[in-house]
Amino acid sequence: MSKIVKVIGREIIDSRGNPTVEAEVHLEGGFVGLAAAPSGASTGSREALELRDGDKSRFLGKGVLKAVAAVNGPIAQAVIGKDAKDQANIDKIMIDLDGTENKSQFGANAILAVSLAAAKAAAASKGMPLYEHIAELNGTPGKFSMPLPMMNIINGGEHADNNVDIQEFMIQPVGAKTLKEAVRIGSEVFHHLAKVLKAKGLNTAVGDEGGYAPNLGSNAEALAVIAEAVKAAGYELGKDITLAMDCAASEFYKDGKYVLAGEGNKAFTSEEFTHFLEDLTKQYPIVSIEDGLDESDWAGFKYQTEVLGDKIQLVGDDLFVTNTKILKEGIEKGVANSILIKFNQIGSLTETLAAIKMAKDAGYTAVISHRSGETEDATIADLAVGTAAGQIKTGSMSRSDRVAKYNQLIRIEEALGDRAPFNGLKEVKGQ
């Protein structure tokens, strides 16, 4: 038995300089797992609760000492002596002990950190890499693939201090034959984009996820400068590289309308905004749009799915918040055709795996994702490979908190070789 003998929680700092929870899980035999919870900026209202202290005298109220105390106290007491290899049981113990619908007693940040640390410790005790252990937990032992990255090279919305409404403009290096080649192509386009922006006298400072955050004349201009950079890098848009966007539309949804500051404060209805996006897909090879409407606008999402769902991937992030109850409703109503997977929206590895399985069983794709507040923890790389999810969103080609995930994927690809195919555009719904 891989018995848990010690659990340690601590407050560490994330990529935005805010505190987050790190957990260590120690097993018999000296095996240790270490994991940290990420944190979002544009968050869905139905996400599991991230517990913050609210004490304005520390970290402007963002301390996580209460969550850390939960790890070191009741959570540790409950899981010590239990088998770390039984992930479902470890997670159930913590969820039941918390006793709330949204993990607000201990905080999803506390429960998730322990959940992931336990998985890492269990993998170590089995003498296998984390991705291999995750594949076993997923009921798909030995089944791996390398994910197609969505690289967020222009940041707007809540991730940047600029006038661009749409939160993420991403490139997907679909012409690559391997993950490593995809990273190289992404890096080359990223550097050419800096040159394009500089030549236009635009800012090349980066946002939370490592993409550039220039002030632009419109949202379409972001796509235009990316197209220029792709060409300058020697690649063909639509063949070597496709585009993806995260609208994070809840952030500019006001009084039932979608108000775009970057389009001269123009207000759109749900239908009008869907057609605004449809027009962009006709001008550029956009194959994936995330949160194209507000999380509460289910009628609008149904319409958007009818208009665009057979042509492109429509990803629900704030819409589904990695929650199987909400995803089930979406599947039944024919809303979206893909789910974004974020550990900390739901708060445990077991529930995350359940959401991925439900999506795949329904013919939806699952896109594994970072948060805008990250750490050096690269667990999502192992999750993407170990569930053969097929797609990953982990930022741009700068900032160590983003690059850590790409580097881990490069290592995993090297270790697995032909056992983990890179399927490129075939992974994207509708392509």
Swiss-Prot record:
Per UniProt, which keywords does this protein have?
A: Cytoplasm, Glycolysis, Lyase, Magnesium, Metal-binding, Secreted
Q: Which residues hold Mg(2+)?
A: 246, 290, 317
Name the coenzymes or cofactors required.
Mg(2+)
Q: In which pathway does it act?
A: Carbohydrate degradation; glycolysis; pyruvate from D-glyceraldehyde 3-phosphate: step 4/5
Q: What Gene Ontology cellular-component terms does the record carry? A: cell surface; extracellular region; phosphopyruvate hydratase complex
Q: Where is the active site?
A: 209 (proton donor), 342 (proton acceptor)
Subcellular localization, as worded in the UniProt entry: Cytoplasm; Secreted; Cell surface
Q: Which InterPro entries match?
A: Enolase, Enolase-like_C_sf, Enolase-like_N, Enolase_C, Enolase_CS, Enolase_N
Q: Does the keyword Hydrolase apply?
A: no
GO MF entry, a single one: magnesium ion binding
The note on cofactor binding and number reads: Binds a second Mg(2+) ion via substrate during catalysis.
Q: Which SMART domains match?
A: Enolase_C, Enolase_N
GO-annotated biological processes? glycolytic process
* Keyword Metal-binding in annotation: yes
Task: Write down the top EC class of this protein.
Answer: lyase
Residues reported to bind (2R)-2-phosphoglycerate: 167, 342, 371-372, 393
Q: What is its EC number?
A: 4.2.1.11
Q: Which reaction does it catalyse?
A: (2R)-2-phosphoglycerate = phosphoenolpyruvate + H2O
Coiled-coil ranges from the UniProt annotation: none
Q: Which NCBIfam families match?
A: eno (TIGR01060)
What protein family does this chain belong to?
Answer: Belongs to the enolase family.
Report quaternary structure and partners. Answer: Component of the RNA degradosome, a multiprotein complex involved in RNA processing and mRNA degradation.
Q: What does this protein do?
A: Catalyzes the reversible conversion of 2-phosphoglycerate (2-PG) into phosphoenolpyruvate (PEP). It is essential for the degradation of carbohydrates via glycolysis.
Name of the molecule in the record: Enolase
